[in-house]
Amino acid sequence: MPTINQLIRKPRSRLIVKSKSPALENSPQRRGVCTRVYTTTPKKPNSALRKVAKVRLTNGFEVISYIGGEGHNLQEHSVVLIRGGRVKDLPGVRYHIVRGSLDLQGVKDRKQSRSKYGAKRAKKAA
């Protein structure tokens, strides 16, 4: 326990909270242009071909972001919306691309969790 004199000489240091998604700069989402769309493999216990895109954001950052859902229509120069949220088994992927917004279409034939994948409600068969 420091004395009051010691605290006057050197105050307690404030805890610095580091952002988990610095490229967003405290915005909920950011717009960007795809510079490369490709697949990559996850870390050790898992095995797959995960779809990711390298995106140049409007604020100049270049980030790798994940494309969720089955199938996508992204190519180079597609304009996309980025949100925060990392992918645990892909190192360096700290952002997700928002489905159903700007150039990225929603997931086709999606019945559950539609809002997360930008899918419209299916028409009732009468």
Swiss-Prot record:
GO terms for biological process: translation. Coiled coil: none annotated. GO terms for molecular function: rRNA binding; structural constituent of ribosome; tRNA binding. Keywords: Methylation, Ribonucleoprotein, Ribosomal protein, RNA-binding, rRNA-binding, tRNA-binding. GO terms for cellular component: small ribosomal subunit. The keyword Cell cycle does not apply. Part of the 30S ribosomal subunit. Contacts proteins S8 and S17. May interact with IF1 in the 30S initiation complex. With S4 and S5 plays an important role in translational accuracy. Interacts with and stabilizes bases of the 16S rRNA that are involved in tRNA selection in the A site and with the mRNA backbone. Located at the interface of the 30S and 50S subunits, it traverses the body of the 30S subunit contacting proteins on the other side and probably holding the rRNA structure together. The combined cluster of proteins S8, S12 and S17 appears to hold together the shoulder and platform of the 30S subunit. This is Small ribosomal subunit protein uS12. The gene is rpsL.
